[in-house]
């Protein structure tokens, strides 16, 4: 049998499917998620149910978002899970997660994310950070390193700044390729994202911060002077105490927010 087939389902490359099969890893992830009935539990990409089953057994209801119609059909027919699941068939990148919030309950979101959509999905989920209590995701290890990077690191970039603006980022565990079927060609890791109730560095307009980061990191080897010359003047850099000769990966989240707020103040 092909190593792309697991429990009778053939993994689809276009959906980035790699199914988690290591029981020890599954138990550790479920322990980190800490499922409970005081939150709306939401799984993105339940796949064949490796995380779905143990989480659903611990709560009254589990909401899942799955794109693959065949996997949705399997979940509808599952002898145990079918009565515990609320299933949304569709693309998580387009999904409005705010519709899942109920009074007095924030979301706990988790999933073994398809690696081909993990970064855009992170940016999409940040839009709902105020409705989310925790997020736990299996990601490509490289992405977890980017999420948790410090200024000056090669991995530090636009994703780092936006993730750390919205959330506290906590790497949980590393997962080797043989824990999946089919085995991915890269190492994986689980990360915990804890959205801030009060952001350490509030931004007056997060869209300005997004645009600033996109522009700054568009050419990583260039200096801030080159990349941001159309967004901030020499005098504004001096007022902020930021050295224009630095490269974008040398600038802290706090400094990016300060630059964005300077732009907002000028536009006001």
UniProtKB/Swiss-Prot annotation:
SMART domains for this protein: rADc
Pfam families, alphabetized: RrnaAD
Location relative to the cell: Cytoplasm
Leading EC class: transferase
Segments forming a coiled coil: none
Gene Ontology CC annotations of this record: cytosol
Record's catalysed reaction(s): adenosine(1518)/adenosine(1519) in 16S rRNA + 4 S-adenosyl-L-methionine = N(6)-dimethyladenosine(1518)/N(6)-dimethyladenosine(1519) in 16S rRNA + 4 S-adenosyl-L-homocysteine + 4 H(+)
Keywords of the record: Cytoplasm, Methyltransferase, RNA-binding, rRNA processing, S-adenosyl-L-methionine, Transferase
Molecular-function GO terms, alphabetical: 16S rRNA (adenine(1518)-N(6)/adenine(1519)-N(6))-dimethyltransferase activity; RNA binding
Main location: cytoplasm
InterPro entries: KsgA/Erm, rRNA_Ade_diMease-like_C, rRNA_Ade_Mease_Trfase_CS, rRNA_Ade_methylase_Trfase_N, rRNA_adenine_dimethylase, SAM-dependent_MTases_sf
Residues given in the record as S-adenosyl-L-methionine binding sites: 18, 20, 45, 66, 91, 112
Gene3D superfamilies: Ribosomal RNA adenine dimethylase-like, domain 2 (1.10.8.100), Vaccinia Virus protein VP39 (3.40.50.150)
Domain of life of the native organism: Bacteria
Entry EC no(s): 2.1.1.182
Family indicated by similarity: Belongs to the class I-like SAM-binding methyltransferase superfamily. rRNA adenine N(6)-methyltransferase family. RsmA subfamily.
Cited NCBIfam families: ksgA
Purpose: Specifically dimethylates two adjacent adenosines (A1518 and A1519) in the loop of a conserved hairpin near the 3'-end of 16S rRNA in the 30S particle. May play a critical role in biogenesis of 30S subunits.
Protein name: Ribosomal RNA small subunit methyltransferase A
Organism of derivation: Shewanella sp. (strain W3-18-1)
Name of the gene encoding the protein in the UniProt record: rsmA
